[in-house]
Amino acid sequence: MRIGIGIDVHQFAEGRKLIIGGVEVPSPIGLLGHSDADVLLHAISDALLGAAALGDIGKHFPDTSPDYKDADSMELLRHVCKLLEQEGYKPVNVDTMLLLEKPKIAPYIDQMRRNIARCLGLEINAVSVKATTNEKLGYVGRQEGACAHAVCLIENA
């Protein structure tokens, strides 16, 4: 068994959809990025890649490549799962924490968990998505961006 940790940050921008955990969350602003900027799925991808010592998402999906322009991060996560499988690993569980002031995402957490569980081939009780504010401190508190942390456990397939 191996443990991985991932973190991702994206700034907010006008004219972008807010996609978190594969769910489009109603919001007047979204997250800026080369792909769909799904901060939660990016953190999970990094955690899984790290657990298998396969580098990070920047190595596998560079933001300089037109191939990943506006990419669906759920598809990127599926690719990460294939990389794990090729190395003889499979995910066991994922625990995540999302930091943002607004909008409140509690109504969307169950769907995020279902999306992630389905993508990783896990039962929903093996996927945790939590959210908190930053108590108005720092870039998250000023509503300039969002941050996600993820920890995962993988095992030999």
UniProtKB/Swiss-Prot annotation:
EC number: 4.6.1.12
Positions that bind a divalent metal cation: 8, 10, 42
Keyword tags: Isoprene biosynthesis, Lyase, Metal-binding
Binding site for 4-CDP-2-C-methyl-D-erythritol 2-phosphate: 8-10, 34-35, 56-58, 132-135, 142
UniProt site (Transition state stabilizer): 34, 133
Pfam family, one: YgbB
Co-factor binding details: Binds 1 divalent metal cation per subunit.
Family matches, as CDD domains: MECDP_synthase
GO molecular function list: 2-C-methyl-D-erythritol 2,4-cyclodiphosphate synthase activity; metal ion binding
Cofactors that this protein relies on: a divalent metal cation
InterPro entries in UniProt: MECDP_synthase (IPR003526), MECDP_synthase_CS (IPR020555), MECDP_synthase_sf (IPR036571)
Swiss-Prot/TrEMBL GO biological process terms: isopentenyl diphosphate biosynthetic process, methylerythritol 4-phosphate pathway; terpenoid biosynthetic process
Involved pathway(s): Isoprenoid biosynthesis; isopentenyl diphosphate biosynthesis via DXP pathway; isopentenyl diphosphate from 1-deoxy-D-xylulose 5-phosphate: step 4/6
Enzyme's top EC category: lyase
Catalytic activities: 4-CDP-2-C-methyl-D-erythritol 2-phosphate = 2-C-methyl-D-erythritol 2,4-cyclic diphosphate + CMP
NCBIfam families according to UniProt: ispF
Membership in a protein family: Belongs to the IspF family.
Function recorded in the entry: Involved in the biosynthesis of isopentenyl diphosphate (IPP) and dimethylallyl diphosphate (DMAPP), two major building blocks of isoprenoid compounds. Catalyzes the conversion of 4-diphosphocytidyl-2-C-methyl-D-erythritol 2-phosphate (CDP-ME2P) to 2-C-methyl-D-erythritol 2,4-cyclodiphosphate (ME-CPP) with a corresponding release of cytidine 5-monophosphate (CMP).
Xref: PANTHER family: 2-C-METHYL-D-ERYTHRITOL 2,4-CYCLODIPHOSPHATE SYNTHASE, CHLOROPLASTIC
Subunit and interaction comment: Homotrimer.
Protein name (Swiss-Prot/TrEMBL): 2-C-methyl-D-erythritol 2,4-cyclodiphosphate synthase
Gene: ispF
